[in-house]
C-alpha cells in the first residue's frame, strides 16, 4: 500500500523537490530581468533588499529576487581574475538549477546532500547572501582553516561585489582582529574557532571590550555529517595548567608494561601449544570426521578461544582463523561460554589470564590472578582495588567514643586522603593498561617531536590540538617514553552538539548524509534532502572482493594496481590508518610501482599531492584524509583512458566514509570506477559480521588467492555497518542526554555572567546578591541546620567573621519569620557595603585627582570581583561534574538509572554552586581595598587600577583543546 501511494503521489523527497523547482523557475526569471541593469544598479539591490526587510518583508518572499541577484553577479564575473590561496584563477561559475535548488533547501533549514564536484561551495553563497540582509550574524562553518580561507577568497568575492563584508577566522587570529571579523556580514571559519570564541567570551573575557562575538543567527555547516556526527562526542575545552603534576603514570608505567608482557607470554604459549596440535589440519579444506580427532581439535580451539580473550590480535590465532571450520569451532566455544548456564565455567577458564580484553566493546578487566600479580609488582594489597565507602568509614569514626573531636577530624582527613590516593592509582593503572592493550601507534596516534598526536579516525588527519581525556593521553606518553605533561584544568567546555543549538537557524551540506538522516532529525531537527546531480554519474561500482586472509587481500590489491596502472588510469588507494598506508607502500616499492603516500605523517603536502592525483598514471595511497573538501581533477589524458580508479583496502565502520571514498572519482560526469577489497581478518568482519557469513565461508571457500564476490556479500557487509552505526548512534544519543544536563547549567551561569558584564548598575547586582545571602543566613538561623560542618552556635561567629556587621542570633530569632530576619540582615549588609564603597571612591579620588573617574573605576572593580568568583566556582563545579559523571555508572549495580541519578545529583551540585558563588562574592565585596600610588600620568593610572584586582588571578597560558573521549576509541 505504501509503495502504491509513493508511486501515485511521489516520495516526500520528490514532493519537496517539485515544490522548490517552482522557486528555481522564479529565480531564473529574476536573473533575466536583472540583466539590463548596470553594475551599480545591481549593487544597489543589496541596500534595497535590506530596507525591504527592515520594513517588514520576509526573507522567504525576497528569496527569488535575492538568488536572482547572486546568479546575475556570477554571470557578470565570468572571466574576471580571482586570487585564491596565492593562485591566480579566473571566475568560471554560474549556478546551475540544481545548485539553486540546494540553496533554497539550505535557507529552509535542510541538510542538502550534493555529490562530489556538484558545487556545494557556490551553492552556499545564495543563502548566505539572503540571510546576511537581516544584519544578523551569518557563519559558514568548514572542516579546516584552509577551506575557510579558500572559500572566503573564492566565492566570497561574489558577496563583496554586492557590498557585503566577509571575514575569515583561522587559528592564531588576534583578539582585536577577531572583533573586526565578527562585525562582517558573513564570517567563514571552522567549528572549533567559532566554538572556542563562544567559550572565551563567556568564561575568559572579563570586560565587554574583550568579547568578540555578536550572536548566533544563521550557520551553514560544510561537511555537516563530519562535524555534527563524527565530532559529536568531542567537546571543545579551554584549559589552563593544573595545580600539580600527577606522578602515577611515571611511577607505574614499567610495572604495567611488565604485567602486559606476562599476558602476552602466557597467550603466546597457549597459542603455540594449540598450533602444534592443529598444524596438520591447517592446509586441508575439510576436517576429518573421526569423532576422537574432532574432539581433540575442539579442545585446541577451546584454548584458542581463551587466547582470543587475552590477545585478540595474536598471530597464531589469526592464522588458525583463516580456516573456516576452525574459525567456526572457536566461535562455537564463544557462544558456549556466553550462555548463562556456562557462566561459572567461563569465569574459571578466564581466570587463567591476567587480563580479559573485550575487543568488541573496546574494554578490558583485570582478573584475580592479574590483581595478585600487580600486587607483587607494585606492593600493597588487593584492597587497593576496592573503593572505600566513605559514608560507612565516616560513621565508624563518628561512633568511636574513644576518639576526641580533633582526632575524629584528623582521622576523617586521613581516610579522605587514602581514598583519593586509591582512586588516583586505580585510575592511573586503568589508563596505562588501556594505552598498552587498546591504543595502537600509527592507528590511533603518531609520535612526533616528543609529543603524542591523535589521528582522527574518520579523516586520517593528525589533530595536534587534541588530547585524550581522563589521563589517557598521559598514559600513552608514558607508554611511548615521551615527556609526560601535566594534567590541565578545565576552564570552560561545550560539545559541538550543544554549541550549534545556539543558532536560530541551521543548515548543512555534504556528499553523504542520507544514511544518518534519522540522527539529524531526532537530535538536531534537521531534514536531509538529496539534490539531483547536474550530469548523470558515470562511476562503475564493482562488487567487493573478499579474501580469507589479509595476505591474500594485499596480494590482490597490488595485482589490481599493477593492472590498472598499466592502462594509465590514475589510482587512489584508500586506507584506514597510517600503519596500513605505510605497509601497502612497502609492498608497492617491492613491486617497483611508483606512488605517492598521503597520511597523517606528511599531511602538509596534501594540496600538492591531491593536485597531482588525477594525472595519467598517478598512484596515490592515502588514508581517509583525502575524503573531505578535496576534489581530484583529471587531466584530459586520464579522462580518455577511463578516469580515476578508486581502491578501498577495507570497509570502514561507517558507510559514509566508504561513500566519501567512492565519491573521489566520477565527478561532474567524468568516468571512473571503485572497488573495495576485504579479508575476513578485517576488524569490521571480525567484530560485527553476521554469523551467516561464517556459514557461507565454510560452504563456498575458494582456493587460496581467489576472491569471493557477490552482491549477497555486499549486503551482509552493509548489515554489519548498520549494526555499528546503530551502536554508535545510541552512544552519541546517550552522551547528549548527559551533556544536556550540563548545557542547561552552562547557559544559566553564562547568562548570569553576561548580566554582570552588561549591567548598567553593578551596585544593584551587588545588593541583589547580598539579599540572597541574607535570606540564606535567615533560613539557617530559623532551622538549626548544619552549615558547612558548623552547628548553630558557630553560625554567629561565621557571620561576623565573613561580614563586618554585628548580629545577635538570639535577638534575630525573636523576629516573626525568615523574611523579617532576612530583611534586617540585608539592610545592615547593604548599608555597610554602601559605606565601604563610598569610602573606597573617596580614597581613590583623593589619590588620583579630579581627572580620575573614581566611581566608574570602583564599579569596574566590583564587576571584576563578581566575574572572577563566578569563573572560579564554575571551574570547581566542572571538576565535580566530571567526577559525578565518571562514578554515576556504578549506580546500575543498585538497580538505579544512572541518568536519573546524574540529573538529581547534578541539580544538587548546581544549587550548591549558586550558593557558593553568592557567598563568595558577598564575602569578597567587603574585602575590597584599592591603593593608588601618586602618578602624574593619570591616563596610565586608570586602566591599572581598574584591572589590577582581577589580574591577580593567574590563569596561566590557556590551552584550546579538543578532547577526545577515551571510551569512544573503537
Swiss-Prot record:
In terms of PROSITE patterns, this protein maps to: SECA (PS01312), SECA_MOTOR_DEAD (PS51196)
Which SUPFAM superfamilies would you find in this protein's record? Helical scaffold and wing domains of SecA (SSF81886), P-loop containing nucleoside triphosphate hydrolases (SSF52540), Pre-protein crosslinking domain of SecA (SSF81767)
Q: What is its main location?
A: membrane
In short, the EC number is 7.4.2.8
Keywords in UniProt for this one? Answer: ATP-binding, Cell inner membrane, Cell membrane, Cytoplasm, Membrane, Nucleotide-binding, Protein transport, Translocase, Translocation, Transport
Substrates-to-products reaction catalysed = ATP + H2O + cellular proteinSide 1 = ADP + phosphate + cellular proteinSide 2
Q: Which Gene3D superfamilies match?
A: Helical scaffold and wing domains of SecA, P-loop containing nucleotide triphosphate hydrolases, SecA, preprotein cross-linking domain
Keyword set includes Cell membrane: yes
| CDD domains reported in the protein's UniProt record | DEXDc_SecA, SF2_C_secA
State its location(s): Cell inner membrane; Cytoplasm
MF terms in GO = ATP binding; protein-exporting ATPase activity
Q: Name one GO cellular component term.
A: plasma membrane
Q: Topology relative to the membrane, per the entry?
A: Peripheral membrane protein
SMART domains hit by this protein: SecA_DEAD, SecA_PP_bind
KW Ribonucleoprotein (keyword) present: no
Where ATP is bound, by residue?
A: 99, 117-121, 631
Q: State the InterPro entries in the record.
A: Helicase_ATP-bd, Helicase_C-like, P-loop_NTPase, SecA, SecA_CS, SecA_DEAD, SecA_motor_DEAD, SecA_preprotein_X-link_dom
* GO terms classed as biological process: intracellular protein transmembrane transport; protein import; protein targeting; protein transport by the Sec complex
The entry's family comment says:
Belongs to the SecA family.
* Main function: Part of the Sec protein translocase complex. Interacts with the SecYEG preprotein conducting channel. Has a central role in coupling the hydrolysis of ATP to the transfer of proteins into and across the cell membrane, serving as an ATP-driven molecular motor driving the stepwise translocation of polypeptide chains across the membrane.
Q: How does it assemble?
A: Monomer and homodimer. Part of the essential Sec protein translocation apparatus which comprises SecA, SecYEG and auxiliary proteins SecDF. Other proteins may also be involved.
Listed PANTHER family: CHLOROPLAST PROTEIN-TRANSPORTING ATPASE (PTHR30612:SF0), SECA INNER MEMBRANE COMPONENT OF SEC PROTEIN SECRETION SYSTEM (PTHR30612)
Against NCBIfam families, the record matches this protein to: secA
Name by which UniProt lists this protein = Protein translocase subunit SecA
Amino acid at each position: 500500500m505504501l509503495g502504491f501511494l509513493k508511486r501515485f503521489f511521489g516520495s516526500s523527497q520528490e514532493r519537496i523537490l517539485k515544490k522548490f523547482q517552482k522557486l528555481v523557475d522564479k529565480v531564473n526569471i529574476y536573473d533575466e530581468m536583472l540583466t539590463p541593469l548596470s553594475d551599480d544598479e545591481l549593487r544597489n539591490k543589496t541596500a534595497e533588499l535590506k530596507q525591504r526587510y527592515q520594513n517588514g518583508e520576509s526573507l522567504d518572499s525576497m528569496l527569488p529576487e535575492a538568488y536572482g541577484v547572486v546568479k546575475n553577479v556570477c554571470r557578470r564575473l565570468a572571466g574576471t581574475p580571482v586570487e585564491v590561496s596565492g593562485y591566480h584563477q579566473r571566475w568560471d561559475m554560474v549556478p546551475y538549477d540544481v545548485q539553486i535548488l540546494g540553496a533554497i533547501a539550505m535557507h529552509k533549514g535542510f541538510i542538502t546532500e550534493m555529490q562530489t564536484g556538484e558545487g556545494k561551495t557556490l551553492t552556499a553563497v545564495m543563502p548566505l547572501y539572503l540571510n546576511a540582509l537581516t544584519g544578523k550574524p551569518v557563519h559558514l562553518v568548514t572542516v579546516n582553516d584552509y577551506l575557510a580561507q579558500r572559500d572566503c577568497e573564492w566565492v566570497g568575492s561574489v558577496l563583496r561585489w554586492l557590498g557585503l563584508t566577509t571575514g575569515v577566522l583561522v587559528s592564531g587570529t588576534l583578539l582585536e582582529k577577531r572583533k573586526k571579523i565578527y562585525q562582517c556580514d558573513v564570517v567563514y571559519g571552522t567549528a572549533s574557532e567559532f566554538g572556542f570564541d563562544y567559550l572565551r567570551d563567556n568564561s575568559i573575557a572579563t570586560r565587554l571590550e574583550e568579547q568578540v562575538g555578536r550572536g548566533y543567527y544563521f550557520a551553514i555547516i560544510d561537511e555537516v555529517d563530519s562535524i555534527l556526527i563524527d565530532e559529536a562526542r568531542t567537546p571543545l575545552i579551554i584549559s589552563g595548567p593544573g595545580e600539580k603534576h600527577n606522578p602515577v603514570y611515571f611511577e607505574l608505567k614499567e610495572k604495567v608494561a611488565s604485567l602486559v608482557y606476562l599476558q602476552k607470554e602466557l597467550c603466546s604459549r597457549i597459542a603455540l601449544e594449540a598450533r602444534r596440535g592443529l598444524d596438520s589440519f591447517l592446509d586441508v579444506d575439510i576436517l576429518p570426521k573421526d569423532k576422537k580427532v574432532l574432539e581433540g581439535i575442539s579442545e585446541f580451539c577451546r584454548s584458542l578461544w581463551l587466547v582470543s580473550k587475552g590477545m585478540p590480535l595474536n598471530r597464531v590465532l589469526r592464522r588458525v582463523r583463516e580456516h573456516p571450520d576452525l574459525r567456526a569451532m572457536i566461535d562455537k566455544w564463544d557462544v558456549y561460554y556466553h550462555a548463562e548456564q556456562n557462566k561459572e565455567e567461563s569465569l574459571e577458564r578466564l581466570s587463567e589470564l591476567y587480563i580479559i580484553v573485550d575487543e568488541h566493546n573496546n574494554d578490558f578487566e583485570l582478573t584475580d590472578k592479574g590483581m595478585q600479580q600487580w600486587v607483587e609488582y607494585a606492593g600493597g594489597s588487593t584492597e587497593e582495588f576496592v573503593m572505600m565507602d566513605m559514608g560507612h568509614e565516616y560513621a565508624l569514626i563518628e561512633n568511636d567514643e574513644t576518639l576526641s573531636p580533633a582526632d575524629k577530624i584528623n582521622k576523617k582527613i586521613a581516610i579522605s586522603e587514602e581514598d583519593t590516593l586509591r582512586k588516583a592509582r586505580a585510575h592511573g593503572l586503568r589508563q596505562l593498561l588501556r594505552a598498552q592493550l587498546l591504543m595502537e601507534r600509527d592507528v590511533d596516534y603518531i609520535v612526533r617531536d616528543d609529543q603524542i598526536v591523535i589521528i582522527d579516525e574518520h579523516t586520517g588527519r593528525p589533530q595536534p590540538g587534541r588530547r585524550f581525556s581522563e589521563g589517557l593521553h598521559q598514559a600513552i606518553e608514558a607508554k611511548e617514553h615521551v615527556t609526560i605533561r601535566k594534567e590541565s584544568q578545565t576552564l570552560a567546555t561545550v560539545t559541538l552538539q550543544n554549541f550549534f543549538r545556539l543558532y536560530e537557524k541551521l543548515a548543512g551540506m555534504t556528499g553523504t548524509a542520507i544514511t544518518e538522516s534519522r540522527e539529524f532529525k531526532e537530535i538536531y531537527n534537521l531534514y536531509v534532502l538529496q539534490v539531483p546531480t547536474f550530469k548523470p554519474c558515470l562511476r562503475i561500482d564493482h562488487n567487493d572482493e573478499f579474501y580469507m586472509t589479509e595476505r591474500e587481500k594485499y596480494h590482490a590489491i597490488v595485482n589490481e594496481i599493477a593492472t590498472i596502472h598499466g592502462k594509465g588510469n590514475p589510482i587512489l588507494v584508500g586506507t584506514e590508518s597510517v600503519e596500513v598506508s605505510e605497509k601497502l607502500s612497502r609492498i608497492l616499492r617491492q613491486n617497483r610501482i611508483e606512488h605517492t603516500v598521503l597520511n597523517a605523517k606528511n599531511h602538509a603536502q596534501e594540496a600538492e599531492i591531491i593536485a597531482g592525483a588525477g594525472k595519467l598514471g598517478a598512484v596515490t595511497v592515502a588514508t581517509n584524509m583525502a575524503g573531505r573538501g578535496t576534489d581530484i581533477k583529471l587531466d584530459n589524458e586520464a579522462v580518455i583512458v577511463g578516469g580515476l580508479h578508486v581502491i578501498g583496502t577495507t570497509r570502514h565502520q561507517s558507510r559514509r566514509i566508504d561513500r566519501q571514498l567512492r565519491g573521489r572519482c566520477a565527478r561532474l560526469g567524468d568516468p571512473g570506477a571503485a572497488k573495495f577489497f576485504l579479508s575476513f581478518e578485517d576488524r569490521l568482519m571480525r567484530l560485527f559480521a553476521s554469523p551467516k557469513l561464517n556459514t557461507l565461508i565454510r560452504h563456498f571457500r575458494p582456493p587460496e588467492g581467489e576472491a569471493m564476490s557477490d552482491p549477497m556479500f555486499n549486503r551482509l557487509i552493509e548489515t554489519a555497518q548498520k549494526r555499528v552505526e546503530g551502536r554508535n548512534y545510541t552512544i552519541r544519543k546517550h552522551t547528549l542526554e548527559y551533556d544536556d544536563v550540563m548545557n542547561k547549567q552552562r547557559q544559566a551561569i553564562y547568562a548570569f555572567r553576561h548580566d554582570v558584564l552588561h549591567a548598567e548598575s553593578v551596585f544593584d547586582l551587588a545588593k541583589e546578591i547580598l539579599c540572597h545571602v541574607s535570606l540564606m543566613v535567615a533560613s539557617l538561623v530559623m532551622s538549626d541546620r548544619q552549615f558547612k560542618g558548623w552547628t548553630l552556635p558557630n553560625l554567629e561567629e561565621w557571620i561576623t567573621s565573613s561580614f563586618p556587621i554585628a548580629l545577635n542570633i538570639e535577638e534575630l530569632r525573636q523576629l516573626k519569620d525568615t523574611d523579617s530576619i532576612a530583611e534586617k540582615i540585608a539592610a545592615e549588609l547593604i548599608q555597610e557595603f554602601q559605606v565601604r564603597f563610598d569610602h573606597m571612591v573617596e580614597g581613590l579620588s583623593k589619590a588620583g585627582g579630579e581627572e580620575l573617574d573614581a566611581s566608574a573605576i570602583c564599579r569596574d572593580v566590583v564587576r571584576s570581583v563578581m566575574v572572577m568568583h563566578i569563573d572560579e566556582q564554575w571551574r570547581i563545579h566542572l571538576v565535580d561534574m566530571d567526577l559525578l559523571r565518571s562514578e554515576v555508572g556504578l549506580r546500575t549495580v543498585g538497580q538505579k538509572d544512572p541518568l536519573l541519578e546524574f540529573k538529581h545529583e547534578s541539580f544538587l551540585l548546581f544549587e550548591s554552586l549558586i550558593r557558593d558563588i553568592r557567598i563568595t562574592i558577598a564575602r569578597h565585596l567587603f574585602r575590597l581595598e584599592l591603593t593608588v600610588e601618586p602618578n602624574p600620568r593619570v591616563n596610565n593610572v586608570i586602566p591599572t587600577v581598574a584591572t589590577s584586582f582581577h589580574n591577580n588571578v593567574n590563569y596561566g597560558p590557556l590551552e584550546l583543546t579538543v578532547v577526545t573521549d577515551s571510551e569512544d576509541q573503537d
